[in-house]
Amino acid sequence: MSTWWLVVVAAAAAAGLVRAEDRYHPERLAAGEASAATRSAAESEASFWVREAQEAIERREREGAGAKQAAGHAKNVVMFLGDGMSVPTLAAARTLLGQRRGQTGEEASLHFEQFPTLGLAKTYCVNAQVPDSSCTATAYLCGVKANQGTLGVTAAVPRHDCEASTDVTKRVQSIAEWALADGRDVGIVTTTRITHASPAGTFAKVANRNWENDNDVKQEGHDVNRCPDIAHQLIKMAPGNKFKVIFGGGRREFLPTTQVDEEGTRGLRTDGRNLIEEWQNDKESQKVSYKYLWNRQELLKLGSSPPDYLLGLFEGSHLQYHLEGDESTEPTLAELTDVAIRVLSRNERGFFLFVEGGRIDHAHHDNYAHLALDETIEMDRAVKVATDALKEDESLVVVTADHTHVMSFNGYSPRGTDVLGTVRSLDSNRMPFMVLSYTNGPGARIQQNGVRPDVTTDANFGALRWRTHTDVPLDSETHGGDDVTVFAWGVHHWMFSGLYEQTHVPHRMAWAACMGPGRHVCVSAATVPTAALLSLLLAAFITLRHQCFL
C-alpha cells in the first residue's frame, strides 16, 4: 500500500487539524503492514470466518442438544461491551466495589460475574497481534475479523483505502442489521462519542475508524460522496437511520464549524450540515414520534411513554467520567440503558441493544486506574438494570470486552489491602510500589541511577487523575493481546462457554435469537447440512449488502 496518506496526516497534524483523542489510539503499524501481515488470503474473505463460526456452532449444537430443545429462542438480545475490560480490571473492580461496601474486597462479585456461563474470546486482528477497538467491533458485531483501524469491512480493505471500502463484496453486516431484517428494533448506547469505533461497528462501513465527520475524510484527500463519514452513515444511511435509540456523546461530529452546541462545543463539520436537525426532519417526514435530548434532565422527563425514536447526544465529545460528571447534565449508563430497554421493549418481535462502557479504555490509556475501575462498576450497574427489566426465559444478555489493557494486579499484600494503594512491602531499592501498575503509558517516571522514584510523594498522589506506577514511557498506554471474558445469562447461555474466536460472538447470539443468515436454534442441526447452509448464508450476506447500500 502506498504511503501517500502518511504525508497527508502529517501535514494535518502540523496544522493542528488531527483530533486530540488520537493520543488514545496512535497508529502504530508501519505503512504497508495493513495488508502484508495477513496470514493467509482466505482470512481476507468473510466466508472464512463465517464458515469457522458456523462449524463451531454445529459442534456445540450436538453437545447441548437437550438444553437446546428445552429453552426456545431469545426474543431480546442485549450485548454489553466493556471497552478494554481485562481480567485484572474485573478483579480489581470487584475488589474496589467490596472495599467501598466496607468489606476486605476480594470476596465481592460484580453482578455479571454471577452469570451462569463464562467463556473466553481471542481478540487479534487479521494484521495485528494486539487489536484496536475497530477490528474487534467488526469481529464481535459482524462475525468477521478485519484489519486494525477498519470497521464493517473485510481484511481485503487496508486501512485508509477509501476505494477498496466501496466494494460491496468487501462489506459485512452486523447483528444489528440482522435484527432489523427480522423485524426487531435496535438501539445503541455508549459513554463515548456515538461515532467512536465500538458503537460504529453496528452500522458503519469505513476504511478508517477516525473518519467520524466529513472533514476527517477530506483531510486524507478522499471524496465524502464515495466514502461517507461515520456520523453521516448513522443519520442518513441504513441501518443507522432505522435505529430506535441512539445514546452517547459526540455532538461536534454532527454540527458545522459555524455552530456551537448547547454547552459551547464547536462543531467539526465543514460541509455546513447540521445532522441533528436532519435526523429530526427525517423523523418528521416519516410522521413518527421522536425527540432529541442533550442532558440528563431531558432524559429523566421522558417518563413511562417515551417517543418511538430517541437521539441523545449528551456531550460535545465523550461523556464525562462518572466520578467527574455533572449530575444535572450527565446521565449514568444505567439510566441510559433503562430508557433504551423501555423504548425497544414495545416491539413484540423483540430487539437488539448494544451498550458500551467505553471510558474504561480511555482511563487505562491514561494510567488512571481508579477511573477505569469505577467505569467498570458503572457498567455493571447498567447490566443489573437490564437483567432486572428482562425476562430470563425470553432474553439473552452477553457481557464481554473488545480487548484488554496492560494493567497488572500484583504484589503479595495481605487480604484487604487498599486496591488503589501500595503493596505492603518495598522493592529491592526500598521503594514502595502500587497494587495496580501498568507495563507502559504516560505515567512512567524518570529513574535516577536505576532507582524508581517514590510515587507516594507525588503532590497529587491518590487523586482521580493521578497516574499509577508505569514501566515503559509512552504517550498512551497500549492494549493487551490476551483473551477477553464472555459472560452470558438467559436463553441458551450455555452456547458461550469455552475458548473461541471473537467472531463467534455475534453468530452465537444470532443462533440463540433465531435471526440472521446463519444456523438458528429454531432449525434442527440435522435439517440443514453445514455445506448447504453456508451456501445460503453467503447468498444472504450478499443480498443484505445490496439492500443496505441502496
From Swiss-Prot:
Keywords: Cell membrane, Glycoprotein, GPI-anchor, Hydrolase, Lipoprotein, Magnesium, Membrane, Metal-binding, Phosphoprotein, Signal, Zinc. It is found in: Cell membrane. It is an enzyme of class 3 (hydrolase). PROSITE patterns: ALKALINE_PHOSPHATASE. Its cofactor is Mg(2+); Zn(2+). A lipid is attached at S524 (GPI-anchor amidated serine). Binds 1 Mg(2+) ion. Binds 2 Zn(2+) ions. Disulfide bonds: none annotated. One of its GO terms (molecular function) is alkaline phosphatase activity. InterPro entries: Alkaline_phosphatase (IPR001952), Alkaline_phosphatase_AS (IPR018299), Alkaline_phosphatase_core_sf (IPR017850). One of its GO terms (cellular component) is plasma membrane. Its EC number is 3.1.3.1. It is a lipid-anchor; GPI-anchor. Residues 525-550 form a propeptide. Residues 1-39 form the signal peptide. Gene3D superfamilies: Alkaline Phosphatase, subunit A. PANTHER family: ALKALINE PHOSPHATASE, ALKALINE PHOSPHATASE-RELATED. Belongs to the alkaline phosphatase family. This is Membrane-bound alkaline phosphatase. It comes from Bombyx mori (Silk moth).
